[in-house]
């Protein structure tokens, strides 16, 4: 498969010119190592299942429940789905969604290290591709999607309005945007949340990461047609045409 303006590097489609993201990638991998969130190929292949002794076992149980809810929702749709995951990391969720019958999945991120791991681990999934994308106004091939998913990733985008407005033209007529596993705040909560984030990264010795983390509030979605599907304090959001749904 050849895409104009993209080169395939270790299984990942990479634009011929990269305009942003490399410093974030370096800082992000550094903090992931300190958090014990860099997984071996063997571990990634099994996610969201993970050893009960792993320090993040309970977190992965929550992610597994969230995934099952999303998978059931999508499996009930009476059509083949073309899916884009934004912020796919090591690709476990993109690969899991690629198990939907007749689906096609594109996983994207600006973390080339994790993308290459994803391409390596899931190389035998024929309906799955991975892209390094730093500008979602420049999706390769003018492709359109039935679903765009942000799973624990929208907090790394500074503007909800900007990223969602960039994504809307990428949807098919009845397409949906989903946002999951991200906490959305009331305005009165933001100051304290920012301090907690700074304190957390300060303990890890990675205060630069606090500058990449954005504490979005519910009112940022006011210009969109949004529906909350599930909200135990976090969210999944589904955007259909101009509508959005949240599911934690």
Regions found by a protein language model. Give the residues of each.
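A short, conserved alpha-helix within the catalytic core of class I
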Residues: 157-167
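Conserved Class I S-adenosyl-L-methionine
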Residues: 191-213
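Conserved alpha-helix/loop element of class I SAM-dependent methyltransferases that forms part
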Residues: 59-79
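Conserved beta-strand signature within the Rossmann-like core of class I S-adenosyl-L-methionine
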Residues: 174-183
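A conserved beta-strand element that flanks and buttresses the S-adenosyl-L-methionine
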Residues: 149
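Class I SAM-dependent methyltransferase SAM/SAH-binding core
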Residues: 92-137
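Short alpha-helix
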Residues: 209-229
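N-terminal auxiliary segments of SAM/dcSAM-dependent transferases
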Residues: 1-38
């Amino acid at each position: 498969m050849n895409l104009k303006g993209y080169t395939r590097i270790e299984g990942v489609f990479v634009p011929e010119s990269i305009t942003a993201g490399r410093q974030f990638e370096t800082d992000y991998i550094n903090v992931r190592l300190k958090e014990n969130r860099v997984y071996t190929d063997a571990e990634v292949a099994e996610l969201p299942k993970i050893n009960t002794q792993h320090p993040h076992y309970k977190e992965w149980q929550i992610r597994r429940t969230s995934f099952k809810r999303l998978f059931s929702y999508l499996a009930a749709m009476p059509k083949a789905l073309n899916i884009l995951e934004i912020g796919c990391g090591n690709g476990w969720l993109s690969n899991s969604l690629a198990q939907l019958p007749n689906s096609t999945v594109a996983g994207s991120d600006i973390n080339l290290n994790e993308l290459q791991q994803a391409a390596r681990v899931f190389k035998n999934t024929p309906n799955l591709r991975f892209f390094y994308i730093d500008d979602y106004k420049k999706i390769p091939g003018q492709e359109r999607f039935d679903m765009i998913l942000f799973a624990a990733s929208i907090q790394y985008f500074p503007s909800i309005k900007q990223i969602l407005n960039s994504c809307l033209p990428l949807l098919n007529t009845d397409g949906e945007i989903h946002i999951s596993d991200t906490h959305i705040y009331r305005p009165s909560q933001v100051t304290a949340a920012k301090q907690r984030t700074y304190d957390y990264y300060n303990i890890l010795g990675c205060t630069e990461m606090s500058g990449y983390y954005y504490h979005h509030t519910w009112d940022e979605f006011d210009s969109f047609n949004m529906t909350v599907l599930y909200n135990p304090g976090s969210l999944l959001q589904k955007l259909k045409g101009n509508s959005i749904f949240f599911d934690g």
